[in-house]
Amino acid sequence: MPDSDAQRRLSRGSPLDTLGENPDQEQGWEILKTFRSMGWDGGYRWRIQLKIMPRRQKTVTLNGLMYGDRWDGSPITRVDIVENPADVDAQGELIESETLRLLFRSGRGAFAMTKRSDVSGPPKVVDGSAVLEPIAGSEFALFDLMAPYVYWPRFRYEGRTTFRGSPTHLFWMYPPEEDLELKKRIGGVRLYINDQFNVLIQTQVFDTEETLLKTIYISGIERVDGQAIFKEMDIRNDVTRDKTRLKIVDASMGLSLPKNLFEAQSLMENLQTQNIAIGREERFEVVE
């Protein structure tokens, strides 16, 4: 298990910091359980941009749309990423957009499916090591978006430290023993969970030689419809130093979303063209 950057910059300013010592694993388990149970109230709709920033090539920006909710306590997400926008040819004929459609669920009952708008046939199930492959030419993989490592059963609580000026809990997550394909490529994942907001502010993915492969981190937290969300999420390839930024351009929170939005049939049509019945979650206040 490699030392964390935070451990090398360990702050002794707070008597509550335990990183580098022998933190209570039972306490760590309670912290992790609480984090896993957290989620936004209701569903959400985000208009997003993927800014692909390779070190030695031109930056490319892709637009997309993301819907999310929770099924039986597990996050489920439907995403469209427009890889090539609609256009017209020299004769004035419409050239349809090329869109990558994604549907995935994390935690209990996890699965992932994809469908390209320009390819005929049913959606494809993504499993095994295929979840580690980049999507839409970016540094993001389904593995990063699904974050299955949050739910891996075997972990070590590394302790609490001050990271980016805030109290933060660090966990080392071990890949499941039964997932042999994954274990060939991933040696472990380190989580940085902010104690104040109870959100994952940074993730580090390591290979089997404990070499840092990628770092995922969020920038900025804002409130939308009364709920805290991140503004941007960056993923950096620590081998090539290429980077991709996921930016939330516009957000609506606390939505009531139809179940069929998160079914495989939804992948047969772009989100922009679907008639999605969106409502607002009802909130009741106790009157004394």
Predicted regions and their residues:
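Gram-negative outer-membrane assembly/targeting C-terminal domains
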Residues: 259-288
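Well-ordered beta-strand positions enriched in small/hydrophobic/aromatic, beta-favoring residues
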Residues: 46, 77-79, 110, 155, ...
